[in-house]
Amino acid sequence: MSYIKKLRARLDSGEISAVELTKEYLAKIKEQDKRINSVITLCEAEALKEAEDADAIISAGKQGLLTGIPILHKDLFCTKGIRTTAASKMLDNFVAPYDSTVTKNCKDQGMVTLGKLNMDEFAMGSTNEYSYYGAVSNPWDLERVPGGSSGGSAAAVAAGFAPISTGSDTGGSVRQPASFCGLTAMKPSYGSTSRFGMVAFASSFDQAGIFGHYAEDVAIMLDAIAGECEFDSTCVGVKQNHFTQDLEKDISGKVIGVDESLIKDLPAQIQEAVSKTLDNFKKLGAEIKSVKVPDLKEALSTYYIITPAEAAANLARYDGIRYGYRNPEARDLDELYRKSRTDGFGAEVKRRIMIGNYVLASSQYDSYYNKAQQLRKVMTDQINQIFTQVDAIFMPASPSEAFKKGDKLDPVSAYLSDIYTIPANISGLPAIAFPIGFANNLPVGGQLMAKAFNDNILTQMVVQYQKHYGIEEFILQQARI
């Protein structure tokens, strides 16, 4: 079950050329994205040139699996010669002088970049309402959010603007939007993909991820972007075919841990979807085992102390001098810093910078930041202990279906949207979200988390699940090829 393989067959047979396929997707974006607002920059000329190059490779019989396959990138991955905004006024006119490792790996395999995608500013948000370029709409219901921060990445694939897209995941930013938009998306183990050229939010949490309809496509793409990188010291690399090596194997004997206390208070329709999903895994031969997951509220508090601290440090570089927005009315250096940052950053980014500077202050450091780091270590150890008993942990990807725009502009309410996804980021573990049912006629997702660098177990389990139970009901009509 793979869109990529379906497109590969069409391209190789001559049914369609890479240029024709690219034109189809570009036309669809230009016609339909006015309603969704998922694309910040459409790379029409560049895409057609890359498609021509792909056709030449195909004609010579030297194509790979991804040659000529269109892709959209979240607009925090640097793309040489194309602006990279992070959905911020601060970087509105920034044109990257180099490619991120993620985008370079895609280019090197002959993929066609259609454009750059909307997101919450600097990846800070769970709704994609915090963008300098306006909110993104969920293709399932245009009055609702697509999730965040990779909301544009999820909405674009759900709407059929590309078969695949890149995103980033700091606290659930690929998994929660996947749940809201009926997609499969994965945050791989921390260090398996390079962060070089990816605009930083919280460096010890950030990781590139992939959106698609099918888990097989997600696995194929993660193999494409993963690997060692000399420019990122945290990137340890993974072996070739790390994510796709076990996709054909059945999951009989796999043990899935479930903490019932995380499910009992969910809305009834989501509980039903979870119960059905676990029953389906049992039918495939998996064993369901009761486990106790660390307190998610403590995880949430830990996350929202450490990540703002890292963000405050990372965003200190945007000063109006080296690059980024520069206020034209400043009369001296102090005023230049102050006005450029005041005008250049949005409300949510400024909120997190202020929180970060507060917890890093010498008077507060031990009370907040130091304790949060200690708790992070304790929680990571507790989660890893669970993996001595199970192969994966299952939990919902979100506590609700997609909510309406404006419903959760209160920061604390919005932060709670990440409660199920944050543990994987705190501990650096791989986690995959996939559609499991509907609540109020909107898709909801489940999530599997595994031990570090056991990413292949997750892709294997979800590929086998989708092979037997399908995902057709989660693909919107306009997204079908």
UniProtKB/Swiss-Prot annotation:
It catalyses: L-glutamyl-tRNA(Gln) + L-glutamine + ATP + H2O = L-glutaminyl-tRNA(Gln) + L-glutamate + ADP + phosphate + H(+). GO terms for molecular function: ATP binding; glutaminyl-tRNA synthase (glutamine-hydrolyzing) activity. GO terms for biological process: translation. InterPro entries: Amidase (IPR000120), Amidase_CS (IPR020556), Amidase_dom (IPR023631), AS_sf (IPR036928), GatA (IPR004412). SUPFAM superfamilies: Amidase signature (AS) enzymes. It is an enzyme of class 6 (ligase). The keyword ATP-binding applies. Keywords: ATP-binding, Ligase, Nucleotide-binding, Protein biosynthesis. Its EC number is 6.3.5.7. One of its GO terms (cellular component) is glutamyl-tRNA(Gln) amidotransferase complex. The active site is at 74 (charge relay system), 149 (charge relay system), 173 (acyl-ester intermediate). Heterotrimer of A, B and C subunits. Belongs to the amidase family. GatA subfamily. NCBIfam families: gatA (TIGR00132). This is Glutamyl-tRNA(Gln) amidotransferase subunit A.
